[in-house]
Amino acid sequence: MNEKSYPRIGETVLEKTLPNGLKIFIVPKPQHRKKYAFFATRYGGMDIQFIRNGEKCDTPAGIAHYLEHKMFDTKDGNALQVLSQNGAEPNAFTSNAMTGYYFDCTEHFEENLRILLSFVSVPYFTDAVSYTHLRA
């Protein structure tokens, strides 16, 4: 891990890039009980047009915000509820250029982090639910 110190503000940031390109940043805060995790992706409200198989593909306005909510669905239920039951305070937001998922907690951080990484890495979409919501 690369370490960068910011002495003016008394912070150190550890950074590592995984083989898949995912960048991880850790800001150690040993004096704090509460821990915080944030996962961001470069996909936001302005991302409505793509090239798929060489052809332009338009998606509906609001699709990023819709997907932000759908990402919490898992085959076993809703990740928001699981995180909350596990003592975390989860949330998410969509801006023009990104979508972020995060939580904070004082206990069970590693388990909550696994849950977060699982639902953002393995989306659970069903044809019926997706089609119904997109038509609304």
Please give the residue ranges for each predicted region.
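His/Glu-rich zincin catalytic helix
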Residues: 1-79
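M16 family metallopeptidases and their MPP-like homologs
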Residues: 27, 32-50, 62, 78-122
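Conserved small/polar residues in nucleotide/adenosyl-binding loops
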Residues: 132-136
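Short secondary-structure capping/junction motifs at helix and strand boundaries
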Residues: 123-131
